[in-house]
Amino acid sequence: MAMKKLLIASLLFSSATVYGAEGFVVKDIHFEGLQRVAVGAALLSMPVRTGDTVNDEDISNTIRALFATGNFEDVRVLRDGNTLLVQVKERPTIASITFSGNKSVKDDMLKQNLEASGVRVGESLDRTTLSDIEKGLEDFYYSVGKYSASVKAVVTPLPRNRVDLKLVFQEGVSAKIQQINIVGNHAFSTEELISHFQLRDEVPWWNVVGDRKYQKQKLAGDLETLRSYYLDRGYARFNIDSTQVSLTPDKKGIYITVNITEGDQYKLSGVQVSGNLAGHSAEIEKLTKIEPGELYNGTKVTKMEDDIKKLLGRYGYAYPRVQSQPEINDADKTVKLRVNVDAGNRFYVRKIRFEGNDTSKDSVLRREMRQMEGAWLGSDLVDQGKERLNRLGFFETVDTDTQRVPGSPDQVDVVYKVKERNTGSFNFGIGYGTESGVSFQAGVQQDNWLGTGYSVGINGTKNDYQTYSELSVTNPYFTVDGVSLGGRIFYNDFEADDADLSDYTNKSYGTDVTLGFPINEYNTLRAGLGYVHNKLSNMQPQIAMDRYLESMGDPDASDFAADDFTFNYGWTYNKLDRGYFPTDGSRVNLTGKVTIPGSDNEYYKVSLDTATYVPIDNDHKWVVLGRTRWGYGDGLGGKEMPFYENFYAGGSSTVRGFQSNTIGPKAVYKNGARTSGGDNDEYEDCTQESGCKSDDAVGGNAMAVASLEFITPTPFISEKYANSVRTSFFWDMGTVWDTNWDPSSAPSDVPDYSDPGNIRMSAGIALQWMSPLGPLVFSYAQPFKKYDGDKAEQFQFNIGKTW
């Protein structure tokens, strides 16, 4: 042993010359210190083998090769005669990774970043990488204004050369902006310029965008906003000279100073376009026209470049280059814009592929495409396909990816990546709605039946006032041209009194069939035929009902039956960005019906629904929604429209904050009628000669409803569920009236129900959730304009209604 130590000491002492330039032949290789790494694996990583002649350079290469494996903290190579002695110290293996004190950064995100750097359980620990991670995390906190933050890696040794790794965070508090100064501005005040920033030194309570917490990225965005503000107003020489960010000694306050040079305003003198225009010079020229004397505007220049790219993209030039170079003339304060265009190659579509459609068949998606395989690539056609897939309502998200075909100079594949949502439900259960009380529901509803695109529904409902069942089927592509065919059969037993309406019972059944004819991308016409049988009973005579029965020649009937055949028609304009929870676009839906010969009744009825979504931010998280609903109907040939076909308002789908159906005309019962009491649970006879006023709604033949909503991000909801939950603040208004009402036929204390000016209003908040059980809608509204007989209902909850 003493001899060995002496040998090693002598080797170390003479390490510079032990191998010699002439080298020596390696007869054997021994390792010391290996634990986890196998000898064979270590030998394979070495450039030296038994029998090789090695010198100093070979030994250096061996040390580098062993270090390069990442398995060792220290490597020494010694000579013992003709034996190489390799002494190593293995890096410890990570047994566990934990985090402490991190609030701004989630554990999952930290684990992903660590794994990307090669730090994971079961791998060896590289302390150099660990130091880089500490610094990187601290830099992240500094970028979001937390200058007192610190991140420390605590390594705890364990048996068998293992360690526990714990990252300890001290995040501290975000530094708040104390003051923002802009130096060098003369044309605009500092207050005016800062009002366009996200970062503020003062934030009013009503400002939901401004923020006093400093973030490096937000400052960069604000500086770009400042630059654009000046460039859009003709200041072509504008420049941000410098930016100083000063930190208070306690690291809790920030002072920002921006030094600028405004320069003078410049006007455009002309636009000159050159380059490869691919034969579209006339169209490009239209996009580059300017008004004489127009101020230079950076945003308009960028938009012009984008418009040229979009134009060329429609003709298959998928990767055009458009560069604008302003030529500034300081003498006359003008700018001549030189635009260089290179259309590049025209690309053709080899294949259109779909990814993520595990349920929906390819054919269902492919029939929505406007881009054809083999044709040149049209960016507008690809976008139309995306819009049409979104409007189906089958998918949470739809993304497109244009991929160049390897080895081909002019071919691409277009890939549509979809994320399917649950388009169907099977339910059997008991529910509660504020409009319907306790309800029993059972049914199957599938908007994408077996992935074919068919909509199939078998539904039944039983609640306090209704027993309803329906079977419906719709084929959206009955023909290859997109003509749809839909039909349904239904049965309904309706107790009007229990629905806060006038007293009568209506048992009805019927069927209808409808064809839909697409006119273009956004417009569809519908036409169809329907049949319905209505059996009325338990009718308590009231003025509106009596007026109808009299027109039918049976004024004293307490029971009545009618069979009607109708011609149904409709028109839909749909330019919404997606089928559910839209954020942009408009939808207009006109529906109507008119009785045809062979019917007992003679009347027509038409309604118009509109909805417009206007996003106010680029991410479409803040959206303004305007909705209207109009309805009108009347009798034909001297007959009245049936009272059971009247329009109603009030409830979650019209004017929230009011009980369902309670807005508008109320029943005025005739002398001798059995009327309901105020709580709809006690009855008494009407004994007044002129009739008895009541709170029972009868609806009207005309309706107008409007709503203004402000859709906001839902607080406390992660991005994963953001597309399934919607929160909005709303203002509803509406009314129902009877154009055939005769005030002289009712007691003097009864309002004039022919007056359309009796508008009800409410305001509140709504939450919609696309739950696994179906759409759930919660709303709380406070009526602030109502009339005699209206019934308030602040909280409302329903299943299956969204807008």
UniProtKB/Swiss-Prot annotation:
Keywords annotated in UniProt: Cell outer membrane, Membrane, Repeat, Signal, Transmembrane, Transmembrane beta strand
Coarse class of the protein's main subcellular location: membrane
PROSITE patterns per UniProt: POTRA (PS51779)
Any single Pfam family the record assigns to this protein: POTRA
Keyword Membrane attached: yes
Any GO CC annotation of this UniProt entry: Bam protein complex
Domain of life: Bacteria
Secretion signal, residue range per the UniProt entry: 1-20
The keyword Transmembrane belongs to this UniProt entry's keyword annotation: yes
Functional note: Part of the outer membrane protein assembly complex, which is involved in assembly and insertion of beta-barrel proteins into the outer membrane. Constitutes, with BamD, the core component of the assembly machinery.
UniProt similarity note: Belongs to the BamA family.
Subunit structure: Part of the Bam complex, which is composed of the outer membrane protein BamA, and four lipoproteins BamB, BamC, BamD and BamE.
Protein name (database record): Outer membrane protein assembly factor BamA
Species of the source: Salmonella agona (strain SL483)
Gene: bamA
